[in-house]
Amino acid sequence: MASKKMREEATCSICLHLMTNAVSISCGHSYCHVCIVSFFENLNRMTPGLKTFSCPQCRAPFTMASLRPNKQLGNLIEVIKEMDQEMSCEEHGEKLHLFCEDEGQLICWLCDRGAQHKGHATALVEEACQGYKEKLQQAVTKLRQLEEECMNLKVFTAEQITKWNEKIEFQKQKIQSDFKTLQRFLHEEEKSYLWKLEKEKEQTLRRLRDNEANLEQKNHELQSHILELENKCQGSAQKLLQDVKDTLSRSWAVKLEQPEALSLDLHTVCNVSELYFDVKKMLRRHQVSVTLDPETAHYELILSEDRRQVIRGCPQENLDNSSRRFSALPCILGYEGFTSGKHYFEVDVGEGTGWDLGVCMENVQRDTVMPQTPQSGFWAIRRCKEGYVALTSPLTSIHLTEKPLVVGIFLDFEAGVVSFYNMTTGSHIFTFPKASFSDTLRPYFQVYLYSPLFLPPPDE
């Protein structure tokens, strides 16, 4: 039911009913449109030509032109009418003061006594309202929990979308990088095979042309002998018999040596389909032998005699304090340096739980802890507790479906490319953005506890 104050605001002070087509005058008071117009007309009849009128409530002056529809008040009146209609029993016209629990309906006192609600549990509206308000609040609490859960799921789904897009982008870059690497390799292989084919062509052609030249020379000799014999046959008897035995002897002594037998079978044969799908073969064409440089080893690193294996252990004594030695981190460099060309080497990481692998500039800092990023002269990847990352700035997460037991590292010095491969599966791991190398590059390793590294020889 509408409050007393609401009803007072919606009641016209002229007709004392809820306003119809409420309008306001300049002082702010409102009236029914019909009532205030009738008020004007009555005053005009008493005082013809009157232009200014006094508000029936506050006596403030106003004019007819100041009338304005009061939509807000009109809306309030409609609400009050609906409330009045809802709060009255449609059957009996009585106020709905009771609530039937069995039917879940508002009823009046006559309904309560009728046959329809006989024996039903009823309560005063105020009492029933309090109980149901608590239940509604409980329902609101539950729905808010569901709303919060829904929002959390929405956030989770948005994160999944982001992660999925990142995964797709990573895979896209990986595919593009793999094909670029493959295209470079195929281009180099094409040039290599064409060069070999051209070389084989020239070698065989040179021998064939030698045969051709020898046969040409022999043909001239035969033609000379034939001409000599034909001239004798066509001459006089005395001329024919002159030195005839010597001429015959020389003629019968002429032999035709067979040219060098040459096979026309091609030795330079390229199976493009095999090249295309054999990544391991592709990389190992550039494989170099890498050993460890003991003069760069951190004092906790222990090398094998052949300098192909390193493990982290107790600090080594009696080591010199060379500026070439890593003193801040347990790192070591490969003995070999690269200043041009393509190079590939492998590192057997086994079941190790941590390692850094890659290449670095010859002049990197070795006595201070610093980020091992390309900006500092390092191009390396890492395995740690969190998984696999490329040492970029910021770090780049690497998602691998299979754990590499052997990691292949490929360097194209002129192209500025450093790539990493899982040689357990032959799949690409990561390629750094193109760089410009200005210094000698050397293989780089950081050794973790219980994670030895082994550099297999190229023929293994």
Curated annotation (Swiss-Prot):
Recorded protein name is E3 ubiquitin-protein ligase TRIM38
Q: What class of enzyme is it?
A: transferase
Instruction: List keywords of the entry alphabetically.
Output: Cytoplasm, Immunity, Innate immunity, Metal-binding, Phosphoprotein, Transferase, Ubl conjugation pathway, Zinc, Zinc-finger
The protein's matches in InterPro entries, at most eight in alphabetical order, are given as: B30.2/SPRY, B30.2/SPRY_sf, Butyrophylin_SPRY, ConA-like_dom_sf, PRY, SPRY/PRY_TRIM38, SPRY_dom, TRIM/RBCC
Q: What is its EC number?
A: 2.3.2.27
| Pfam (any one) | zf-B_box
Quaternary structure annotation from Swiss-Prot or TrEMBL: Interacts (via B30.2/SPRY domain) with TAB2 and TAB3.
Q: Where in the cell is it found?
A: Cytoplasm
**BP-aspect Gene Ontology terms:** innate immune response; positive regulation of canonical NF-kappaB signal transduction; positive regulation of viral entry into host cell; protein sumoylation; protein ubiquitination; regulation of gene expression; regulation of viral entry into host cell
Q: Coiled coil: which residue ranges?
A: none
The zinc fingers classed as B box-type run over: 84-125
> A GO molecular-function term, please?
ubiquitin protein ligase activity
> What are the B30.2/SPRY domain coordinates in residue numbering?
270-460
Describe, by residue range, where the zinc fingers (RING-type) fall in the chain. Answer: 12-59
Which species expresses this protein natively? Bos taurus (Bovine)
* Pathway the protein contributes to: Protein modification; protein ubiquitination; Protein modification; protein sumoylation
**Which reactions are catalysed by this chain?**
S-ubiquitinyl-[E2 ubiquitin-conjugating enzyme]-L-cysteine + [acceptor protein]-L-lysine = [E2 ubiquitin-conjugating enzyme]-L-cysteine + N(6)-ubiquitinyl-[acceptor protein]-L-lysine
Sites where Phosphoserine occurs are at 66
Task: Look up the record and report any one GO term of the cellular component aspect.
Answer: cytoplasm
- The stretch of residues making up the signal peptide is none
Q: Quick one: which residues bind Zn(2+)? A: 89, 92, 111, 117
**Protein's job:** E3 ubiquitin-protein and E3 SUMO-protein ligase that acts as a regulator of innate immunity. Acts as a negative regulator of type I interferon IFN-beta production by catalyzing 'Lys-48'-linked polyubiquitination of AZI2/NAP1, leading to its degradation. Mediates 'Lys-48'-linked polyubiquitination and proteasomal degradation of the critical TLR adapter TICAM1, inhibiting TLR3-mediated type I interferon signaling.
Where mainly found? cytoplasm
